[in-house]
Regions:
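N-terminal helix-rich module
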Residues: 1-2, 7, 16, 21-148
């Protein structure tokens, strides 16, 4: 009696069912990991934008304003007596919340963060992707910018 080697239809359906269950479990985890990576990248990018604006203000001896919208779009402008001159703009790729009014701050000639048009230093923070990963970019009173 010869025996044929192979899989039965029942074995094949069982393997497909197990594979479907494993995929259903893994896909949400992959999406969560992607959102964490996106928030990390956006926080690093915002910290770089803020540090660059601070260095620009110190190098030129004039205020530089950074505005960040809730959808992650940002703009950097030199503040002149005649108004603002755009320097850079871009997208962070994640939603942003801030305790700065309208998500805007200025770095003065000394590199300290202030509210737009203000003179007193003001610390604050930007929360990136609060609904998912919640990375925070902190601007300290002395001007130090760091990610947490």
């Amino acid at each position: 009696v010869s025996r044929q080697h192979g899989s039965t239809l029942l074995e094949l359906v069982t393997i497909l069912a197990i594979s479907a269950v494993l995929c259903a479990i893994a896909v949400p985890g992959v999406a969560a990991v992607r959102s964490v990576f996106a928030a990390d990248a956006a926080a690093d990018r915002l910290a770089l934008v803020l540090r660059d604006a601070q260095a620009r203000a110190q190098a030129h001896g004039a205020a530089v304003r950074v505005s960040v919208a809730g959808d992650g779009c940002y703009s950097v402008c030199d503040v002149c007596p005649s108004g603002e001159r755009p320097v850079a703009r871009g997208e962070l790729g994640a939603d942003v919340e801030s305790n700065y009014p309208q998500g805007a701050l200025e770095f003065g000639a000394a590199g300290w963060p202030t509210l737009p048009g203000g003179a007193s230093p003001r610390a604050g923070h930007f929360t990136i992707g609060a609904a998912t990963a919640g990375r925070v970019v902190v601007v300290q009173l002395g001007g130090c910018v760091r990610c947490t």
